[in-house]
Design a protein with these regions (language model features):
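Conserved hydrophobic positions within beta-strands
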Residues: 76-78
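Flanking helices and flexible, charged tails adjoining ferredoxin-like Fe-S electron-transfer domains
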Residues: 100-126, 131, 136, 149, ...
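Histidine-anchored nucleotide/phosphate-binding helix
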Residues: 176-191
Length: 439
């Protein structure tokens, strides 16, 4: 198996919660369940104010081909359907459910099911009905990903267990606490692709996970565990495909175009739960960490739980946070309020003290080339920044600015402290909007 690697950086891991076993967080009195927890069209509400709903009930139906169902995480009463703020600041239609404390589930939830008796289309339908999306942060509807144009061209199914983002440990805890779900979910996916082999890719700074998964798959002829070098952004889709297969994927391609299906460990475990245990997506494992947090921890959380309640479950703040990030410091989203709900793509809440947050004034580029040397997309950030400063979309496209994966490596390494990644995010949005206008 190939062991190639794209350009990368070494970052401090800060995996302080790696040894913290996942705890089930107390269920809140109210959950706020967004209709837009995925890439694509928002889901359409299927309930009305005053309705009683059950845990496991579909309360939002996919609003298009690229969309996903939304499942209620508690039983109770719909108190409102109204716009609520999400992590990215957008006001999104949401269903507010008052938890009745009975935790009554839809009939059939939790029942065992033998996946070997299911057809490929039945498996895909179950995944769709369960509301499963890419849980590593992308949020792409999983049933769509599992339906490539040519399923016979898929020869790799890669389980992404790299978790290269600093501070995050939720995937690691799942690897060592629930490996049977990951292996079981991978076996289900392999039923869909007759020519594929399964690879569980884990960075080599997680030896316990590698050992445990290797032992679990020793008698599985189509599944192997692939230890990866510990680099950032090793968990990026393009990076992990190249590391495992030696194949390159650009922005105009899907992983399926390179014969690969890539799913995060939580996504694969959720497929197992949906197909083998008749349990739709109702929960997430979330890391709450950072020096401002009294008791950093990994929590098993009901979707729709408020971030503020997550903080309280971790003992609150031991010191006033200077910055709070949904996710990790490299690719996470800074928050101006914690009055937002946990959604399908949530992975962590990282709370920094003032001492942890460095504020620098950017200075002039010294053309050192460090940003070029670490870019996994092999593009030239220094030239892209010039185009971004001039709002020159044409040049930005010509120099392959749309190949940027927004990993933050260039910003991290820049001695002039220039906000490269932020500028590229804005330019990519502008270029994409211009393309849509042109049709």
């Amino acid at each position: 198996m190939s062991q190639k690697h794209l350009h990368s950086i070494h970052v401090s891991h800060y995996k302080h919660t790696a040894g913290c076993a996942t705890e089930v967080m107390p269920v809140p009195d109210v959950v706020k369940i967004s209709m837009s927890q995925h890439i694509g069209a928002p889901a359409k509400p299927l309930v009305a104010k005053g309705d009683r709903v059950l845990a496991g009930q579909k309360i939002g139906e996919a609003g298009g081909f690229i969309s996903a169902n939304v499942i209620c995480s508690v039983s109770g009463t719909v108190k409102a359907i109204e716009p609520r703020r999400m992590v990215n600041g957008a006001m999104v239609p949401s269903i507010i459910v008052e938890n009745d404390g009975e935790y009554e589930t839809v009939e059939g939830v939790g029942e065992d099911r033998d996946p070997s008796t299911l057809s490929k289309e039945e498996i895909r339908s179950i995944v769709k009905e369960a509301g499963i999306v890419g849980l590593g942060g992308a949020g792409f509807p999983t049933h769509v990903k599992l339906t490539p144009k040519d399923e016979n061209a898929i020869d790799y199914v890669i389980v992404n267990g790299a978790e290269c983002e600093p501070y995050l440990t939720s995937d690691y805890r799942m690897l060592i606490e629930e490996p049977e779900k990951i292996v079981g979910g991978l076996k289900v996916i392999l039923q869909l692709f007759d020519n594929a082999k399964g690879v569980i890719a884990i960075e080599n700074n997680k030896p316990e996970a590698i050992k445990k998964l290797t032992e679990m798959v020793k008698d599985e002829p189509k599944i192997t565990v692939c230890p990866l070098l510990t680099k950032y952004p090793q968990g990026g889709e393009r990076s992990i495909i190249y590391a495992v297969t030696g194949r390159k994927v650009n922005s105009s391609m899907l992983p399926a175009d390179a014969g690969c299906i890539v799913d995060n460990v939580d996504t694969v475990a959720s497929i197992y739960m949906a197909v083998c245990k008749s349990t739709p997506l109702m929960r997430k494992i979330i890391t709450i960490t950072g020096d401002a947090v009294a008791e950093p921890q990994n929590f098993n959380v009901k979707l729709g739980t408020n971030y503020q309640e997550l903080i309280e479950a971790a003992g609150g703040f031991k010191t006033e946070p200077e910055k709070i990030i949904s996710g990790g410091p490299m690719m996470g989203q800074a928050l101006f309020t914690v009055d937002v709900p946990v959604c399908k793509t949530s992975s962590a809440l990282t709370c920094f003290t003032k001492d942890q947050v460095a504020a620098f004034e950017p200075t002039a580029c010294i053309r050192c080339g460090r940003c070029v040397s670490v870019c996994p997309s092999h593009i030239v950030p220094v030239m892209m920044m010039k185009a971004a400063m001039n709002r020159d979309c044409e040049t930005f496209e010509k120099i392959n600015g749309m190949e940027c994966m927004e990993c933050g490596s260039c910003t991290y390494i820049c001695p002039a402290r220039r906000p490269l990644t932020q500028a590229f995010k804005e330019m990519r949005k502008t270029v994409a909007a211009n393309r849509r206008k042109k049709g």
